[in-house]
Amino acid sequence: MLLHGFTAAWGIWHPILADLVARYEVIAPTLPGHLGGPSYPADELITFERSTDAVERLLDELGVGAAHFVGNSMGGGIALELAKRGRARSVVALAPAGGWTCGDGEGPRIGNFFARQIKMLERTHAWSERIMRRPGTRRLAFREIMRHGELVSPADAASISQAAVGCAISRRAIQALLADEVGLTIGDLDRITCPVLLATPQFDRVLPGPRHAPRYRREIPAVRAVTLSGCGHVPVWDDAKLVTKLIVEQVDGNLGPSPDAPSDVQSQSAAAGP
């Protein structure tokens, strides 16, 4: 199961989807509150716990007891939450969110970052399809989240921008970040029993490794940590081959049943889109 980041949608995985689908059955949902996905309840707080509840419900609907999870940013945090609940056979966490601690200033910094990004995209939204035709424009537009935005196709670039502008929970989530709410950090990591690969992009400008990886490296049992050389926060576009290689190694190396998965439900995956 592939879990995208905040303000994105399932299509962010395009660079690696074909290779993964050729090897596995893949679930690539758009998460609640994001463009093309189910709604996020208006009366619920924006937290990793609530977002993970929604993914668990999807797993139950599909008859999936446990799965291999790949998550980027917010999706990486959700993948770790699912691992805590015993729903993961393995996890590949690409620049996972939630590794900061309340009071260290990172929540408000990230909230301000997304507020600026969305404001900029809203200003140019009407012309996104036209201006994203130029490689130089794509590199400039995505410089905060990837090193090589010019590698994104014009159609995908427009879709990424549209997803950010159309994210229904963006303002609520930004307010939660600015308020430094505890529900946006992840604790109790010692409950994780499955293999976890923590992949930290070398040039992450959203969740810089030196500030966001250390707690995960310390607290996730037997975590394997690697650095994604030459990559930014969304590494699937900067180096799709490297990310695919790491996923295949992690999944193929952990094909046994999850010890925590419900025994009465066969673990499987199902191809799914939005």
Language-model features: locations:
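Conserved alpha/beta-hydrolase catalytic His-Asp/Glu region
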Residues: S128-D190
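Gly/Ala-rich beta-loop-alpha elbow adjacent to hydrolase catalytic centers
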Residues: G71, G75, A79
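Conserved loop-alpha-helix segment in the C-terminal half of the alpha/beta-hydrolase fold
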Residues: A18, R191-C231
